[in-house]
Amino acid sequence: MKQATFSEVTEKVRETVFRSPLADRLSGISVDENDDELGGEFLRVVLEVKGLNTFKLDQMTPLVQSIEDAVAEIDERFASVRLAEAA
């Protein structure tokens, strides 16, 4: 299984996010390595959004897909992208 280092994955996610026209709506990004219930590994990507009520969720779909595609180029683990309202 092709796996990039944690820092490579994090950098790839950051590059993808900051190229997005929605970058100004985000206040943070976190990437964590996780295990599923079946013993498989995946990457949890959390995008901290400045205000979940300031846009429609479908506006984030292209960014989520871009992150999933970018991670897939360097790592075979699935990138599970989630949104969270920034504190």
Regions found by a protein language model. Name each.
Residues 69-87:
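A short amphipathic beta-strand at an alpha->beta junction
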Residues 3, 53, 57, 84:
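Short, charged/polar micro-motifs that form catalytic or ligand-binding hotspots
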Residues 23-48:
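Short edge beta-strands and adjacent turn/loop segments
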Residues 1-32, 61:
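N-proximal, solvent-exposed amphipathic alpha-helical segments enriched in charged/polar residues
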Residues 44-62:
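A short interface-forming secondary-structure element
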